[in-house]
Amino acid sequence: MRIAQLANFIGPASGGVRTAVAAMGQGYADAGVERLLVVPGPTDAVEETEAGTVVSVRAPRVGGGYRLIVEPWRVVDALERFAPTSVELHDKTTLLPVARWARRRGVATVLLSHERLGDMLAMRTGLDTSARAPIALLNRVVVRSVDRLVVTSGYAEREFRSVAASARCPVTRVPLGVDLETFRPVPSRQRDIAPRDDGVLRLVHVGRLSREKSPHLAVATAVELHRRGVPVRLDVYGEGPHLDELRALAGSAPVTFHGFVAGRDALRRRIAEADVALSVCPGETFGLAVLEALACGTPVVTADRGGARELVDVTSGGWAAPYPAALADAVLDLAARPRDHLRAGARRRAERYPWSAATEAMLAVHAQVTGLTGLVRATA
């Protein structure tokens, strides 16, 4: 089996898509699959890695640290040389011309959808209805262009349910995963924090500081708790275009913006040292930040809708309507519960989502669309 993964809108500091592509790609290689990854880069380059061949295609910057491949034919050149048995798309807009090439060549295509475009654009622009018609048209084009659509949650699946059925495009739900070895609890004796008897409720938010990720809602929740007189501290890890807005929103509340944390172990310690993680975006199709917090033993408060809500249960966190007052209530409810029980429940919840399970499910999808079965090793 020869799988080509294609990703756009990906950069050194980008989050979920980059993490998912890397984790599954390594899993493919470990299973004996020949794997190619094509991504945008500052220059054309080819690198041989233990997880397969990585081809960087020269692409311009489009803001926010991202690069965008604007010449799909150059991706096709890399595919012609690699001769994949299937192509795995991680972008459903700019790379669709590659799906047309694959269909002409008889190469199977799998699209993994990472966002609900309507909700993402609504959160980014504040316009709730104006883009619905063109997005519905795009979704119809998508399901007619690929052989299999993969979604990560029930929330993500609902966007495509009717159009996929009418196009007879099979839809498979594959939850993503978390690195359970990297993201793990910090023993209480090793926590580098102030004594717990100071009474401060420590919150953490990890994510890109861009409107579609709802960092404003996380900050506003901390501000609401501060307004109520709750001793609270919010540490925000991430960077993005709305930092100045968020600082203004925080005002005099105890909110600290730390920027991007490059080391995963350093980030893990900061998450594990918090009492509650705020991952409150109502438009996430999955929520890798939620799983990473849970894996660190930190309970999560999230919105009562969206893919992230599907990851949290009563043993590992709480949820509320995506408004600061409601989320603040959920935080206080969580803080009143036994800490050790919540931390243990959070870790148990994360352990349901190892990357090996996601990789095996995706390999099964590729086997189905290509008809190549029994050609890969089981992943660890």
Please place each PLM-identified region on the residue numbering.
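Aromatic "clamp/platform" in nucleotide-sugar-dependent glycosyltransferases that forms part
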Residues: P282
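Short hydrophobic beta-strand element within catalytic cores of glycosyltransferases
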Residues: P299-T302
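Nucleotide-sugar donor phosphate/pyrophosphate-binding loop at the beta->alpha transition
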Residues: A108-V110, D119-V141, L180
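Nucleotide-activated donor-binding/catalytic signature segment of Leloir-type glycosyltransferases, i.e.
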Residues: D244-V261
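Conserved donor-binding/catalytic core segment of Leloir-type glycosyltransferases
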Residues: R189-V223
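Conserved acidic donor-binding segment of nucleotide-sugar-dependent glycosyltransferases
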Residues: D313-A325, L332-P338
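A short, active-site helix/loop in glycosyltransferases that binds the activated sugar's phosphate group
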Residues: A136, R140, R144-R173, V178-T182
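Short alpha-helical donor nucleotide-sugar binding micro-motif in glycosyltransferases
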Residues: F260, R268-A274
